[in-house]
Swiss-Prot record:
Annotated organism of origin: Bos taurus (Bovine)
Annotated keywords: Dioxygenase, Iron, Metal-binding, Oxidoreductase, Phosphoprotein
Amino-acid positions noted as binding Fe cation in the UniProt annotation, renumbered to this chain: H156, D158, H246
Names of the cofactor(s): Fe cation
Modified residue annotations for Phosphothreonine: T55
Designated name of the protein: Phytanoyl-CoA dioxygenase domain-containing protein 1
Family indicated by similarity: Belongs to the PhyH family. PHYHD1 subfamily.
E.C. code: 1.14.11.-
Length: 291
């Protein structure tokens, strides 16, 4: 079981994040990595959908490329790519398996290996110890952080993209499938930054618009001295409050930094914003965590 102790719960409430080392075994990590290798080996992405992923605001809006490919990925398993991996015709400049930034956004629902991890007894026990009554899974991602050029993730709050009313209802679970160290792009947090609300939001634009999203508000300039690095070993789980500010640096090392991450929402008494880029569909309503 993975229940939090009172001291762990207090630390999460104070800092907005919490590291749980050894949450998954090496065998559990290897099973997900083997499965993702199989998924990548069968990758078939049309030229017009080869969408580079970025969290820099202007680049992000440009990089969506195929608006529908991104906006309709919530109930599918789709591929998003690093910058600079395609030529002007959309052909790969690097081996395809080294080109991927992430795979999202419904591994938790559509793949049995990832569904099993997401709904495991350990995850359910963790959610219960956090007091979640009706948690649902809203999205999932497999993040590669490729060696030598795995892109940085700029400072952000997850609730900017997954907005709810009231706030404080979104929780990220980030699982290291490889050691995540300073050299290969571990997570960095500003402890206690989850108490000041959300500075900006990414919202859908009217149907047919290109790009399909825009930003309301702006990300303030953050004091870099406030960020604390959070290196973790393979198998660790990092709990991430939806409003805590976090980032990761570019991976310039020769080691990847693979991770599986998914987001929960407390559905009881919560409104999922209809302006969010991600929306439940008739084919895939947000599945309850508790089974």
């Amino acid at each position: 079981m993975a229940c939090l102790s009172p001291s762990q719960l207090q630390k999460f409430q104070e800092d907005g994040f919490l590291v749980l080392e050894g949450f998954l075994s090496a065998d559990e990590c290897e099973a997900m990595q083997r499965r993702i290798d199989e998924i990548v080996a069968k990758m078939d992405v049309p030229l017009h959908c080869r969408t580079e992923f970025s969290t820099q605001e202007e680049e992000q809006l440009r990089a969506q490329g195929s608006t529908d490919y991104f906006l309709s990925s919530g109930d599918k398993i789709r591929f998003f790519f690093e910058k600079g991996v395609f030529d002007k015709q959309g052909n790969f400049l690097v081996p395809p398996e080294k080109s991927i930034n992430k795979i999202g956004h419904a591994l938790h629902a559509l793949d049995p290996i990832f569904r099993c991890v997401t709904h495991s007894h350990k995850v359910q026990a963790l959610a219960r110890s956090l007091g979640l009554q009706m948690p649902v899974v809203v999205q999932s991602m497999y993040i590669f952080k490729q060696p030598h050029f795995g892109g940085e993730v700029a400072p952000h709050q997850d609730a900017s993209f997954l907005y709810t009313e009231p706030l404080g209802r979104v929780l990220g679970l980030w699982i290291a499938l490889e050691d995540a160290m300073l050299e290969n792009g571990c997570l960095w947090f500003i402890p206690g930054s989850h108490t000041g609300g959300v500075s900006r939001r990414m919202v859908r634009t009217p149907a047919g618009s290109v790009p399909g999203t825009s930003f309301l508000g702006s990300e303030p300039i953050r004091d870099n001295s406030l960020f604390v690095p959070t290196p973790v070993l393979r198998g660790a789980l990092v709990l991430i409050h939806g409003e805590v500010v976090h980032k990761s640096e570019q991976n310039l090392s020769d080691r990847s930094r693979q991770a599986y991450t998914f987001h929960l929402m407390e559905a009881a008494g919560t409104i999922w914003s209809p302006d969010n880029w991600l929306q439940p569909t008739p084919e895939l309503p947000f599945p309850p965590l508790y089974t």
